[in-house]
Swiss-Prot record:
Active site, per annotation: D108, D294
Ligand binding (Zn(2+)): D268
Control of this protein's activity: Inhibited by pepstatin A analogs.
Keyword flag Chloroplast: no
Protein name in the entry: Secreted aspartic protease 6
Alphabetic keyword roster: Aspartyl protease, Cleavage on pair of basic residues, Disulfide bond, Glycoprotein, Hydrolase, Metal-binding, Protease, Secreted, Signal, Virulence, Zinc, Zymogen
PANTHER family (UniProt xref): ASPARTIC PROTEINASE 3-RELATED, ASPARTYL PROTEASE-RELATED
pH dependency: Optimum pH is 5.0.
A Pfam family hit: Asp
Database matches in SUPFAM superfamilies: Acid proteases (SSF50630)
Leader sequence residues: 1-18
Family: Belongs to the peptidase A1 family.
Residues excised as propeptide: 19-76
Length: 418
C-alpha cells in the first residue's frame, strides 16, 4: 500500500487485528478473529478479507479494480502476534490508556507513527459504503477517560497516496500490545480522518511524519526491555490459511526452509532490498533495482517496462471496460512459478496463481479470465502475493532484511533476536 505523509515521505503498510490470549515466561501471543467483508480491493485502509470481487460491467468487458520472553538470564524476548489472512490488511488489537481502551489498528511496516481515532473524531467519507462513524467502528480513544493521558499540544497530519488522511494532536499514554505494556508512548489522537482504522507504524524512525524524531512503538519496546532488539519477523502463511504471525524481537525457525539470507536495506527510510531479476516460468526479466517488501500491499508493483515484461510473460492480454480503462488478464489456470532472484543467490519461488485474481460479475458468475495482480508504478513493490512465499526478518537496528523460502506449518520454534 502506498502512503505519503505531510512531509512527502513515501510509506507503505501492513495490517494486523488481534486479542491477547496468553502470556508465558517465554512469549507474549495475540490471537486474531477472522472477519469477512466485501469492499473495494483498491481501498488500502478497509478491512477486506478474501471475499470475491463483484463487478458491475457489460458481460463482454472487464474492469480495472482496484511474543514473549526468554527463560534465560536476559528477560527480554520476542513478542509474537498472530495475523489474520485478509485480502488487503492484517489488523491487530491494542489497548490505550489507564483503562485499557481497545482498538483495532493497522500494523504498518512502511510507516512509523501510531495514530488512533478520537472518540469524537469526524469520519470523512471517501469510499463507496462509508457511512456514519465508520472510522470509529474498530474502536476509539477518549483521553479524558485515561488518568495517564497527556496532550502534547502538537499537531499531527498524515496523508496516503490514495488520498485518505488523518489529522489530530500528539499524545502520550500507556499502550498495550500482546500483553506487553509500553509506558508514555507517543502517538497521534486523530480528530478527522477518511481512513477506516488507526495505524500502528513500525518502520524506521526517519520515516516518522513528525518534524521532531521520537521513539515509536518498536523502539519503545526495546528501550523498555520488552524485546532485545528493534527487529521483527513476518509469516503471512498460505493464501488458504486464516492466520499468520508477526513476532517482535523473535524468529520462528520452524516457518522456513533452508537458511535465512541477510540482505542490506537499500533505503534510509523504507524497508527495501536489491532485486536482480524475476524469472516467469522460464522467461527472465532483469530488474537490478531496489524493491520494497510491503506486507500492506495486496499486489506487486514495478516500473512500467519491468511490469509489462512480467505481465506478458504471464500470458497477459489487454482488456478494456466500457469507460476505456485498461486491465491485464490471463488464463486463470496458468501454472508454474515466478522466481525472484535477489543478491547472494537468494531465490524465492512464488506460485503463478498468486498473481492471478478471479473476477466476478455482479450476478456472482466468474469472469472467464483472471486479472494479473502486477501493476505499473513509479516504485518497485513486492506485496502480499510475493510475501506469502517468503519468511522475512526485518532488523531495523542493523539495517538488514533476512529471507528464506517459507514453510507452511503449524509447528513453532521461536527464538529471540539478540
Amino acid at each position: 500500500m502506498l502512503l505519503k505523509n505531510i512531509l512527502s515521505v513515501l510509506a507503505f503498510a501492513l495490517l494486523i487485528d488481534a486479542a491477547p490470549v496468553k502470556r508465558s515466561p517465554g512469549f507474549v501471543t495475540l490471537d486474531f478473529n477472522v472477519k469477512r467483508s466485501l469492499v473495494d480491493p483498491d481501498d488500502p485502509t478497509v478491512e477486506s478479507k478474501r471475499s470475491p470481487l463483484f463487478l458491475d460491467l457489460d458481460p463482454t468487458k472487464i474492469p480495472v479494480d482496484d511474543t514473549g520472553r526468554n527463560d534465560g538470564v536476559d528477560k527480554r524476548g520476542p513478542v509474537a502476534v498472530k495475523l489474520d489472512n485478509e485480502i488487503i490488511t492484517y489488523s491487530a488489537d491494542i489497548t490505550v490508556g489507564s483503562n485499557n481502551q481497545k482498538l483495532s489498528v493497522i500494523v504498518d511496516t512502511g510507516s512509523s507513527d501510531l495514530w488512533i481515532p478520537d472518540s469524537k473524531a469526524i469520519c470523512i467519507p471517501k469510499w463507496r459504503g462509508d457511512r456514519g462513524d465508520f472510522c470509529k467502528n474498530n474502536g476509539s480513544y477518549s483521553p479524558a477517560a485515561s488518568s495517564t493521558s497527556k496532550n502534547l499540544n502538537t499537531r499531527f497530519e498524515i496523508k496516503y497516496a490514495d488520498g485518505s488522511y488523518a489529522k489530530g494532536n500528539l499524545y502520550q499514554d500507556t499502550v498495550g500490545i500482546g500483553g506487553a505494556s509500553v509506558k508514555n508512548q507517543l502517538f497521534a489522537n486523530v480528530w478527522s480522518t477518511s481512513a477506516h482504522k488507526g495505524i500502528l507504524g513500525i518502520g524506521f524512525q526517519a520515516n516518522e511524519a513528525t518534524r521532531t524524531p521520537y521513539d515509536n512503538l518498536p523502539i519503545s519496546l526495546k528501550k523498555q526491555g520488552i524485546i532485545a532488539k528493534n527487529a521483527y519477523s513476518l509469516f503471512l502463511n498460505s493464501p488458504e490459511a486464516s492466520s499468520g504471525q508477526i513476532i517482535f524481537g523473535g524468529i520462528d525457525k520452524a516457518k522456513y526452509s533452508g537458511s535465512l539470507v541477510e540482505l542490506p536495506i537499500t533505503s534510509d527510510r523504507t524497508l527495501s532490498v536489491g532485486l536482480r531479476s524475476v524469472n516467469v516460468m522460464g522467461r527472465n526479466v532483469n530488474v537490478n533495482a531496489g524493491v520494497l517488501l510491503d506486507s500492506g500491499t495486496t499486489i506487486s508493483y514495478f516500473t512500467p517496462s519491468i511490469a509489462r515484461s512480467i505481465i506478458y510473460a504471464l500470458g497477459g492480454q489487454v482488456h478494456f471496460d466500457s469507460a476505456g480503462n485498461k486491465a491485464y488478464v490471463a488464463d486463470c489456470k496458468t501454472s508454474g512459478t515466478v522466481d525472484f532472484q535477489f543478491d547472494k543467490n537468494l531465490k524465492i519461488s512464488v506460485p503463478a496463481s498468486e498473481f492471478l485474481y478471479q473476477l466476478y460479475y455482479t450476478n456472482g458468475k466468474p469472469y472467464p479470465k483472471c486479472e494479473i495482480r502486477v501493476r505499473e508504478s513509479e516504485d518497485n513493490i513486492l506485496g502480499d502475493n510475493f510475501m506469502r512465499s517468503a519468511y522475512i526478518v526485518y532488523d531495523l537496528d542493523d539495517k538488514k532484511i533476512s529471507m528464506a523460502q517459507v514453510k507452511y506449518t503449524s509447528e513453532s520454534n521461536i527464538v529471540a533476536i539478540n
